[in-house]
Amino acid sequence: MKISGFVYLILITTIINLSFSEANNYCKIKCRSGIHTLCKFGISTKPNCGKNVVKGSGLTKAEKLEILKQHNEFRQKVARGLETRGKPGPQPPAKSMNTLVWNDELAQIAQVWASQCKYGHDDCRNTAKHSVGQNIAQQSTTAASFGSVSNMVQMWADEVKNYQYGSTKNKLIEVGHYTQMVWAKTKEIGCGSIKYIENGWHRHYLVCNYGPAGNIGNEPIYEKK
């Protein structure tokens, strides 16, 4: 269905290179800065959006499967050297790239953060197992409808058009979602979302957490074949 009205999409990425403890108590898990999301807000995923009108919280099983499928199909495409886009393209094939699996702990942390209706990155989201990276997106429209999660994931993947493998001139703000999506060493993903109305805008906010984190220093996104 075509969405009428004015639509814009905001994307932010981040570089994560954080330490973590083995403790299950999230208040004891250390990050570069800030308090862990589950320590600060608790484990409840109940929306905490103030005066904003919440229209939907959490991902359906079908949406979770679609997000995972999109990521793995795109990772496979890049790894096989079939991605022709780039600056310049094509992207080189990879020696190896993990197949992502869904992680409920990462998803819970993502959902708790999404449920705050505060667009931006949380300060600390590590687990006892992993340093954790994050992609976020928010689609907003004046129409009485909400964009799909698959559209937002596709926007992350489409950043490949700005990426040159191995170049030091890549700008994270332009390619950071793509590089996290195809970070070869990442093994797990978990996401959360919320739909709400704010000052007449229908907003759909998606948060995806990745473990272990990508976008680490000067490491390559993957080793080319």
Curated annotation (Swiss-Prot):
<dbReference type="InterPro" id="IPR035940">
    <property type="entry name" value="CAP_sf"/>
</dbReference>
<keyword id="KW-0020">Allergen</keyword>
<keyword id="KW-0964">Secreted</keyword>
<protein>
    <recommendedName>
        <fullName>Venom allergen 5</fullName>
    </recommendedName>
</protein>
<feature type="signal peptide">
    <location>
        <begin position="1"/>
        <end position="23"/>
    </location>
</feature>
<feature type="domain" description="SCP">
    <location>
        <begin position="69"/>
        <end position="210"/>
    </location>
</feature>
<dbReference type="InterPro" id="IPR001283">
    <property type="entry name" value="CRISP-related"/>
</dbReference>
<feature type="disulfide bond">
    <location>
        <begin position="27"/>
        <end position="39"/>
    </location>
</feature>
<dbReference type="InterPro" id="IPR018244">
    <property type="entry name" value="Allrgn_V5/Tpx1_CS"/>
</dbReference>
<keyword id="KW-0732">Signal</keyword>
<dbReference type="Pfam" id="PF00188">
    <property type="entry name" value="CAP"/>
</dbReference>
<dbReference type="InterPro" id="IPR014044">
    <property type="entry name" value="CAP_dom"/>
</dbReference>
<dbReference type="InterPro" id="IPR002413">
    <property type="entry name" value="V5_allergen-like"/>
</dbReference>
<dbReference type="GO" id="GO:0005576">
    <property type="term" value="C:extracellular region"/>
</dbReference>
<feature type="disulfide bond">
    <location>
        <begin position="31"/>
        <end position="124"/>
    </location>
</feature>
<comment type="similarity">
    <text>Belongs to the CRISP family. Venom allergen 5-like subfamily.</text>
</comment>
<keyword id="KW-1015">Disulfide bond</keyword>
<feature type="disulfide bond">
    <location>
        <begin position="191"/>
        <end position="208"/>
    </location>
</feature>
<feature type="disulfide bond">
    <location>
        <begin position="49"/>
        <end position="117"/>
    </location>
</feature>
